[in-house]
């Protein structure tokens, strides 16, 4: 995420406050650096000035008693003001299971509205809802085809028409159909336009009047920066918008400006889109978001993300297999799948305290994903016996040649994958796994040392070596959360 650049700049600015003597000049330089970072993210000038003024009111260096941790006070004040800048203070509507929740999506053409409808449905489907999609966009050619393709891929029921041109009629018919089918989350995708025009707002009003949605969500392109204020305000006044989803925050420098501008309209942001994949869709909670920007991480969010991908029963099964020393190629394959589902690794790094998404150099993340997919392609050409075996010697030269031919890869690629497997299998052998999985909330020094050996050097350096890893495990709250993390992230070392 480009927003990570903003977070990196703010973190570096706060590092100035660790100077031997924190005086007025240090504070001024720190605040100026933060202001520059926010301005580069297209946050409004007045908003930045207000933030600086509020921090200065809180951090009165001359009035602080001797021995006071000035750096901590500055960090806390910056965090609070960033939260205030992004927080509307208004809770958004939350769908409830067991009753039909009707949600209507509105937005300008090109904002990613139709894709976001599917992401929203998919997110709630994983939470146990029974979602459905209605395409009431009759303005854009290909809108129904796009929704149909997305919904089919995500296995979500959908409704639309190639013949009917009245969006109100389609919306009502789709609503009735899915109510009869006991869908508890009916999502209506409406038409977009290239600009805010009267025809668009009138159509939205008619669809809303006919369907009486529980929530109207405005989907907004995050790349427009502070111009988001006018857009969000116009839609809020014309369509009774109850929540906002900001998209395209993975590749634009103006995301911070867009988020702060929307917050200024008092419209709560509930999700942010961070990529094109269906899982590149994150719940937006202000405090964890700011904590990630400041390098404090978001461990509850990370664990929740892992649990949504690896259910609790599968985690227990995984730990049981590892405890028996059964680290197979099939298990490695499943963990590669889990890692790919978790979204960008840079995003995962930002959720760990003391880390930053800047840790993942540009281009390296793509290479890592390509490597995972390459290994999975190779394993697709293996037999069940080969995938489930714990004996590395089973893969003889003739088998390796056969797998290479079947997967369309070179023999050296197969050898590389097998070496990676052997390294991980050795680490998660029955002898080692009991030492690595925390017991009674603690990990031994030997276990921590083993973890350090298998972690990439740049990661170890970023977290501050052994002491940094120990601090991270302490913040995880003991064995329970640490076990969840280990269960969710195995296979990606």
Swiss-Prot record:
Enzyme class: hydrolase
Binding-site residues for GTP, renumbered to this chain: 107-114, 189-193, 247-250
Cellular compartments annotated: Cytoplasm; Endoplasmic reticulum
PROSITE patterns: SRP54
Spans annotated as M-domain: 295-493
Keywords for this protein: Cytoplasm, Endoplasmic reticulum, GTP-binding, Hydrolase, Nucleotide-binding, Ribonucleoprotein, RNA-binding, Signal recognition particle
GO MF assignments: 7S RNA binding; ATP hydrolysis activity; endoplasmic reticulum signal peptide binding; GTP binding; GTPase activity
Gene3D superfamilies: P-loop containing nucleotide triphosphate hydrolases, Signal recognition particle SRP54, nucleotide-binding domain, Signal recognition particle, SRP54 subunit, M-domain
This enzyme's EC code(s): 3.6.5.4
GO cellular component terms attached to this protein's record: cytosol; endoplasmic reticulum; signal recognition particle, endoplasmic reticulum targeting
Positions of the UniProt region annotated as G-domain: 1-294
Catalytic reaction(s) noted: GTP + H2O = GDP + phosphate + H(+)
Entry coiled-coil feature ranges: none
Domain of life per record: Eukaryota
Annotated S-S bridges: none
SMART domains: AAA, SRP54, SRP54_N
GO biological process, one term: SRP-dependent cotranslational protein targeting to membrane, translocation
Signal peptide: none
First-listed, main subcellular location of the protein, grouped into a coarse class: cytoplasm
Family under the similarity heading: Belongs to the GTP-binding SRP family. SRP54 subfamily.
Function: Component of the signal recognition particle (SRP) complex, a ribonucleoprotein complex that mediates the cotranslational targeting of secretory and membrane proteins to the endoplasmic reticulum (ER). As part of the SRP complex, associates with the SRP receptor (SR) component SRPRA to target secretory proteins to the endoplasmic reticulum membrane. Binds to the signal sequence of presecretory proteins when they emerge from the ribosomes. Displays basal GTPase activity, and stimulates reciprocal GTPase activation of the SR subunit SRPRA.
Domain notes: The NG domain, also named G domain, is a special guanosine triphosphatase (GTPase) domain, which binds GTP and forms a guanosine 5'-triphosphate (GTP)-dependent complex with a homologous NG domain in the SRP receptor subunit SRPRA. The two NG domains undergo cooperative rearrangements upon their assembly, which culminate in the reciprocal activation of the GTPase activity of one another. SRP receptor compaction upon binding with cargo-loaded SRP and GTPase rearrangement drive SRP-mediated cotranslational protein translocation into the ER.
UniProt subunit comment: Component of a signal recognition particle (SRP) complex that consists of a 7SL RNA molecule of 300 nucleotides and six protein subunits: SRP72, SRP68, SRP54, SRP19, SRP14 and SRP9.
Protein name stated in the entry: Signal recognition particle subunit SRP54 3
